[in-house]
Every structure is written in C-alpha cells, then in structure tokens.
C-alpha cells in the first residue's frame, strides 16, 4: 500500500512527453518554497494498492510514468513494487523526483533497490534561492537530471541531457 496525494494523467511538466504522474504523500525535507507543501504529511494521502495505481498507469498506452510528491523515496518498498510491475508489464520509462541525492540513495539499500527500475532521477532538495524557471523539469539549479541506468552500469553519476528539439 502506498499513501498517494494525487495521480495526474497526461501531464507534460513532470518529464518529457505525456506522463502519468503519481504524487506520493510524505516528505521529510520540508523545503522552503516547496510547490507542494500539502504533500509533506503522509497522512494527507489516500492509501492505494500498487495494483490500483498500476492500472491507472497502464491505462494510457502513450504516457510514461513519473513518481513525484512528496518524496517517493519516503515509501521505497511500495514504489519499488510499483516500478517493478510497470517495467514487467510495459515499455514505459519512469522518472522519479526526490529530495535525496543520488549518492545518498545508493547508500540506503531500501532506496537503492528502487533505482534499479528508474530511468531518470531528478535529485536534490528544492532550494528557493537557486530557483530557476528556465530549467527543464527542475525547480532549482542544484537539482540534477541523472540517467540512472547508465549511472548504475558505469558506477558513477551520468547526467541525463534533455533536448527539447527532438
């Protein structure tokens, strides 16, 4: 079971193309200026089974998936189960937003397991003083777009570069 604040279909701001965005409830960071402070409390969400969420993600053949929040890494086991099911039953790519850094996630076995199924990670806490509205898919310039699968293979952080012209 996962505590979910909202599920948005056909969003275009949480990664490239059309996406089904799953907004997790619960976040330990409490970043000043957060665009979604109601997501901090895990009890603000609705408890949903991974199967229930999976059906919503699979219902749109053309949309990929995004885990956001809140922080999906606050509920790593449930999101790992969901991501594994998405990958087994579709060819969708999965983006994940988190306030943790990639390096910190690798040190936590529960969170590192989820990375096995994530294609692109947007990492780092939102920092209001580094806010930049010109960035694609990030709120502040300290946040990184990371190609997770390439990073895991290379055993070093590999940036993901988004080219809006493609």
What are the language-model segments listed below?
Residues 8, 125, 149:
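Residues at the C-termini of beta-strands that transition into short coil/loop
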Residues 1-23, 32, 36-42, 157-158, ...:
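N-terminal [4Fe-4S]-dependent radical SAM core
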Residues 75-84, 90, 131-166:
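P-loop/Walker A phosphate-binding loop and immediately adjacent motor/lid segment at beta-alpha junctions
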Residues 13, 103, 130, 154:
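Flexible, glycine-rich phosphate/dinucleotide-binding loops
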Residues 119:
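Receiver (REC) domain switch/active-site residues of two-component response regulators
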Residues 61-68, 93-94, 122-128, 152-166:
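Conserved C-terminal portion of the radical SAM core fold
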Residues 2-5, 18, 36-114:
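Conserved Radical SAM active-site core
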